[in-house]
Swiss-Prot record:
The gene is folD. This is Bifunctional protein FolD. Its EC number is 1.5.1.5, 3.5.4.9. CDD domains: NAD_bind_m-THF_DH_Cyclohyd. GO terms for biological process: L-histidine biosynthetic process; methionine biosynthetic process; purine nucleotide biosynthetic process; tetrahydrofolate interconversion. Belongs to the tetrahydrofolate dehydrogenase/cyclohydrolase family. NADP(+) binds at residues 165-167, 190, 231. PANTHER family: C-1-TETRAHYDROFOLATE SYNTHASE, CYTOPLASMIC (PTHR48099:SF5), C-1-TETRAHYDROFOLATE SYNTHASE, CYTOPLASMIC-RELATED (PTHR48099). It comes from Clostridium botulinum (strain Alaska E43 / Type E3). GO terms for molecular function: methenyltetrahydrofolate cyclohydrolase activity; methylenetetrahydrofolate dehydrogenase (NADP+) activity. GO terms for cellular component: cytosol. Keywords: Amino-acid biosynthesis, Histidine biosynthesis, Hydrolase, Methionine biosynthesis, Multifunctional enzyme, NADP, One-carbon metabolism, Oxidoreductase, Purine biosynthesis. It catalyses: (6R)-5,10-methylene-5,6,7,8-tetrahydrofolate + NADP(+) = (6R)-5,10-methenyltetrahydrofolate + NADPH; (6R)-5,10-methenyltetrahydrofolate + H2O = (6R)-10-formyltetrahydrofolate + H(+).
Length: 282
């Protein structure tokens, strides 16, 4: 039986560092980090993620501002909120919950986030820095994936890694981060032929497709490391893309949902807000 990768445990050390940073600033009567998180509509995964952000931020002493907009808002409505946050010196990080409702122009809206406050690496400029290897905020979910793999003391160099999903939020950036670790990376998507065959060759399988319990044991190589990035609402519960019960006996390591990638992602987001505050003051 495989072992569970506990994202909460991996996050603990980082949380202690954040706590110390915030407490020192409070003791010296200095500004503390503040995150503004924007949610448009009622996507189940986004609501869950925002709630997690707020809970962790509060526990670490970081200010958290929720901005919840109706699903029928316009592009300009969302952009106006972003502009207000760009101009607010008390806000160090802006988090836009994705996906947005389909009638909104996601690229147009993301473009308006200040790169200095883009703590989840959503803007074109931030992503350009990622792909060119320049200093900038790392995208939190992809960074969480790589951090969890590294926590296993596994040498990623030369490993066959399959990333299932090609979104700009997870698939593409996590592939880039793994390339930076010298992995041999294959990206699969809805048009990939022989999907089971490709996935079953992976030493490390990263799944981010938004299909609850889609991946079963037939997609898994014996003793593979499986990282489940999915968070979907399924039968009233938050569920991953991997059928946990069917895969745990075949994988060597597997992240649970919840308690895996998401548990660390939120902590890394808050860490980025602390870094943004340092950059602002330098």
């Amino acid at each position: 039986m495989g072992q569970i990768i506990n994202g909460k445990e991996v996050a603990l050390k980082i949380k202690e560092e954040i706590k110390t940073f915030v407490e020192e600033r409070k003791n010296n009567k200095l500004r503390i980090p503040k995150i503004a998180s924007i949610l448009v509509g009622n996507d189940g995964g986004s609501i869950y993620y925002m709630s997690s952000q707020e809970k962790v931020a509060n526990s670490l002493g970081v200010d958290f501002l929720k901005i919840i907009l109706e699903e029928n808002v316009t592009d300009d409505d969302v952009i106006n909120e972003i502009h207000k946050l760009n101009d607010d010196v008390n806000v160090q990080g802006i988090m836009l919950q994705l996906p947005l409702p389909k009638h909104l122009n996601e690229k147009k809206i993301i473009k308006e986030i200040s790169v200095k406050k883009d703590i989840d690496c959503l803007t074109f400029e931030s992503q350009g820095k990622l792909y060119m290897g320049e200093k900038g905020f790392l995208p939190c979910t992809p960074n969480s994936v790589v951090t969890l793999i590294k926590s296993l003391n596994v040498d990623i160099t030369g490993k066959e890694v399959v990333v299932l999903g090609r979104s700009n939020i997870v698939g593409k950036p996590v592939a880039q981060l793994l390339l930076n670790e010298n992995a041999t990376v294959t990206i699969c998507h809805s048009k990939t032929k022989n999907l089971k065959e490709v996935c079953s060759k992976a030493d490390i399988l990263v799944v981010a497709i938004g299909k609850p319990k889609f991946i079963d044991e037939e997609y898994i190589k014996e003793n593979a490391i499986v990282i489940d990035v999915g968070t979907s609402s399924f039968e009233g519960k938050i569920t991953g893309d991997v059928n946990f019960d069917k895969v745990i006996d075949k994988a060597s390591f597997l992240t649970p949902v919840p308690g895996g990638v998401g548990a660390l992602t939120t902590t890394l987001l808050i860490k980025n807000s602390c870094e943004a505050l340092k950059e602002y003051e330098d």
